[in-house]
Amino acid sequence: MVTQEHLLELFRHKYEQTLPVGWSPLLRRKFGYFNPDDIYEATLDTLVGPETDWLDVGCGRDVFPSNFAMAKILAQRCRILAGLDPSDNIDENPLLHERYKGTIESFQPKRQFDMVTLRMVAEHISDPPGTAAALARLCKPGGRVVIYTVYKWSPVTIVSSLAPFWLHHVVKKRIWNTEEKDTFPTEYRMNTRRDLRRIMGAAGFEEERFSYLDDCRSFARWKLTNLMELVGWKVLRSIGLHYPEVCLLGIYRRSRPAS
């Protein structure tokens, strides 16, 4: 379980190793806010040990795009870090012990894994039952699948689902400064808690943990708009409500054969 103390420790390691600290991390620390990436990274820090065989599905060029140092620590800590991705981006990932270019359905390794992670991958999956069946095949009995993805009914996701695909990169480039080769078609078939429970449950997984992660990053490139997001988040949290923009983080343990 990730604690506030653990998050703060990793926050300092992530943002305060190089001085001066940027205005955005300082602002988030002032508000006591940790973004979804921070929480995902801290969660994996609690799950990865020296005997962990880890498969990162859809890994691309980065295990943690915003935290290479932490990704390197976990890559050195685990026994195996294997990456799987049909994109050529996987060739640029320097931390993988093993890399496989292809789809999860066609992946036939000689081992099973203690942990399989899907970081911002679930929203692109067009065949959820097929993917879940492959995850059950790849995961050891008692092993975990960690799914970190966007929420289907968040404002940005709704707009994205209505917009033509060519517009996705234009918006992502403007707001998050991403590269075109990191933009892929979206499906949003595994992007609610109910859908994840149903799909993963049918494949023999039980939900071990689940969190809605408030996401105040839509306008984080600009100080004023980021401040407005954080103020709004603080007000909503004070009355027990989530911020409208959220991500999903679910951990699913393989407990039985698929139904």
Task: Name what the model sees in each region.
Residues 4-5, 118:
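Long, positively charged, glycine-interspersed low-complexity recognition regions
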Residues 45-158, 248-256:
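Conserved SAM-binding loop
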